[in-house]
Amino acid sequence: MPTPKDALQDRLGYRFRRPELLDEALTHRSVTGPDNERLEFLGDGILNFVIADELYHRRPDATEGVLSRLRATLVNGRTLAEIGKGLDVGTALRLGGGEMKSGGQRRKSILADAVEALFGAIYLDGGFDPSRETILRLYRDRLASLPTEAELKDPKTRLQEHLQAGRRPLPRYEVLEVSGQSHDQTFRVACRLQDAAVTAEGEAGSRRKAEQQAAEQMLKRLEDKHER
């Protein structure tokens, strides 16, 4: 039966010649000794370049702003965490006792950091070409289904444009509830339209994100109403 690290290399499609680099990439800072933060820094730079280069050639007519937003959707922590989960990186991570007990092997930020560290480790182990090939292989499906320019806009902007197109008043956002400790708060926000008895709510760890969720829900309601 393969070890977690062997299985991870199979899923990556890359076999390390220097196993110590793989070990370092999978070592969280909660473990005493060398950790993966420097490799994460390196991998972040490589990832951003590879994705920028690929987008530049895939979208020859896109403006700099569109390319930047496309790249942001691909290299953000959420996407990296999804990739890490798909690779089952958590089973191979080295975590301190406290981090392990608190479920660190499933924490999105830790998975995202480890994926970037793996990109950096592959670059040091095999050079730029293998790191580029690995990144593009892991991003193949996402690159094949890039969002349109309209889809790149955040929900609040899309809702505003939708209402302006119909010459309707802009929405109001109201904080309904703030719960949790000061370092871990949850915001519940309502999005209300002035000319209709329609309200949508969003809930997230920041007011801004909760407003975006509420705007997204409002857009869905307006679209559903339009289709009926």
UniProtKB/Swiss-Prot annotation:
Residues in coiled coil: none
Task: Identify the residues that bind Mg(2+).
Answer: 40, 113, 116
Q: Which family does it belong to?
A: Belongs to the ribonuclease III family.
Where's the DRBM domain? 154-224
Question: Which Gene3D superfamilies is this protein grouped with?
Answer: 3.30.160.20, Ribonuclease III domain
Cofactor(s) demanded? Mg(2+)
Q: Which Pfam family, any one, appears in the UniProt record?
A: Ribonucleas_3_3
Q: Where in the cell is it found?
A: Cytoplasm
User: Which SUPFAM superfamilies does this chain map to?
Assistant: dsRNA-binding domain-like, RNase III domain-like
- InterPro entries in UniProt: dsRBD_dom, RNase_III, RNase_III_dom, RNase_III_sf
Task: Answer yes or no on keyword rRNA processing.
Answer: yes
- Name the UniProt record assigns to this protein: Ribonuclease 3
The organism encoding this protein is: Alkalilimnicola ehrlichii (strain ATCC BAA-1101 / DSM 17681 / MLHE-1)
Looking up CDD domains in the UniProt record yields: DSRM_RNAse_III_family, RIBOc
List every stretch annotated Disordered.
Answer: 200-228
A cellular component annotation (GO) from this entry: cytoplasm
Q: Which GO terms describe its molecular function?
A: double-stranded RNA binding; metal ion binding; ribonuclease III activity; rRNA binding
Query: Gene for this protein?
Result: rnc
Q: Where is the composition biased (Basic and acidic residues)?
A: 218-228
Asked if the keyword DNA-binding belongs to this entry, the reply reads no
